[in-house]
């Protein structure tokens, strides 16, 4: 069945028939493993969202600064979604001392327009740039260029992380 609505054409597809046997032990083993992997993924994302950790977040607040995701939320239009890009950048790198690569990047809406946001997380090594940070930053800019979106930068950075330069 096809339905034309203005320029949008809706096409209904046939339902894909499942051949999974819900009583099969392999099905249960796969399901259990997938649930374990999803739980691990959620834990890694939570760790990345915590940035440099409670100690550095507290120090940041004592300096009168807002956490990176709070700054982003205040920048975006009220209720606007934020699609974070590469939240697990640097996972398993640098002894896990650069959660999310030290920056938060994503797509959100400001003044009614979609934008790419690049924001340093100063709780991660003072917002300094690791090699993966540079890659993540450049990738966000490429996405902005390809989609003709303006970039907004929330900078709170100590420059390059010198031990890795």
What are these model-derived regions, one by one?
Residues 6, 10-165:
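Terminal-region recognition feature
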């Amino acid at each position: 069945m096809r339905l034309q609505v203005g320029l949008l054409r809706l096409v209904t597809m046939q339902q894909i028939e499942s051949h999974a046997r819900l009583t099969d032990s392999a099905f249960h083993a796969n399901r259990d493993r997938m649930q374990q992997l999803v739980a691990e993924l959620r834990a890694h994302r939570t760790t990345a969202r915590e940035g440099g950790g409670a100690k550095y977040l507290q120090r940041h607040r004592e300096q009168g600064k807002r956490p990176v995701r709070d700054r982003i939320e205040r920048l975006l239009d009220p209720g606007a979604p934020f699609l974070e890009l590469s939240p697990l950048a640097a996972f398993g790198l640098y002894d896990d001392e650069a959660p999310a690569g030290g920056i938060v990047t994503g797509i959100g809406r400001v003044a009614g327009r979609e934008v790419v946001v690049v924001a340093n997380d100063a709780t991660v090594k003072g917002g300094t740039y690791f090699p993966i940070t540079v890659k993540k930053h450049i990738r966000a800019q490429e996405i902005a260029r390809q989609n003709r979106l303006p970039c907004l930068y929330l900078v709170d950075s100590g420059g390059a992380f010198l031990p890795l330069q």
